């Protein structure tokens, strides 16, 4: 496998979303552990995480997922080093996930080491739709087999990326990453991003 580009999901891949969930729990008038319990139910049932509000019998905050930007302190400790290391291999590095356009502005403002920054808002389609991954390949300007997609969710990242012909890399952290086992379709599975560049360099 001769990779030319590696694209990264955002939430729970590069960014620890704990602060984000706490903020929305506060806006909904709920304790954080109540939100996390409901989130666990949606993961176990294979539901979209937006269903958690229905399980709790409350309306989502009006600003749900649209006006809260990340902070540089939300990045996982290994995120920047990983992006830089992958870039150091001579590979194109991209960041694109199911995010509002505000994420793109944040990533550029923080000068994250990526050659391509986009979002589902800009692409006009969300994961796990196959078209999302086809557009990722277009952004990479190479063949699908030359692109890797790194994400924490088996259902939204790993399986659909593999089905679209990309190398699918599973990072096992965050709620989904810890509860969803790495499937056979994954090219590689990791508990963090610290050793990703070395693993990519050793791929045939």
Identify what each model region corresponds to.
Residues 1-7, 58, 80, 84-204:
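Asp-based, Mg2+/Mn2+-dependent phosphohydrolase catalytic module
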Residues 1-40:
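Active-site neighborhood of HAD-like aspartate-dependent phosphohydrolases
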Residues 8-11, 36-37, 68-70, 120, ...:
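Short, contiguous strand/loop micro-motifs
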Residues 16-20, 78, 99:
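Acidic donor-diphosphate engagement hotspot in glycosyltransferases and nucleotidyltransferases
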Residues 18, 22, 46-50, 104, ...:
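Short, surface-exposed alpha-helical segments at coil->helix boundaries
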Residues 21-28, 49, 65-69, 103-107:
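Hydrophobic alpha-helical core bundles mediating ligand binding, dimerization, or RNAP-core interactions
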Residues 24, 52-53, 136:
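Hydrophobic micro-packing sites on short alpha-helices
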Residues 35-81:
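Metal-dependent phosphoesterase signature
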């Amino acid at each position: 496998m001769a990779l030319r580009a590696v694209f990264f999901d955002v939430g729970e891949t590069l960014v620890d979303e704990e602060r984000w969930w706490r903020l929305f729990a506060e806006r909904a008038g709920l304790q954080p552990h109540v939100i996390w319990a409901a989130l666990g139910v949606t993961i176990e049932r294979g539901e979209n995480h937006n269903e958690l509000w229905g399980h709790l019998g409350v309306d989502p905050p009006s600003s749900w997922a649209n006006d809260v930007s990340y902070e540089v302190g939300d990045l996982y400790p290994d995120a920047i080093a990983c992006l830089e290391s992958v870039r150091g291999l001579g590979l194109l590095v991209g960041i694109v996930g199911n995010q509002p356009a505000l994420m793109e502005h944040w990533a550029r403002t923080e000068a994250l080491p990526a050659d391509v920054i986009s979002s589902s808002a800009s692409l006009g389609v969300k994961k796990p739709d196959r078209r999302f991954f086809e557009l990722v390949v277009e952004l990479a300007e190479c063949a699908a087999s030359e692109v890797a997609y790194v994400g924490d969710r088996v259902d939204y990242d790993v399986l659909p990326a593999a089905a679209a012909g990309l190398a699918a890399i599973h990072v096992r952290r965050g709620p989904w990453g810890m509860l969803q086992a790495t499937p056979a379709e994954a090219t590689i599975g990791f508990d963090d991003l610290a050793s990703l560049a070395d693993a990519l360099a050793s791929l045939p």
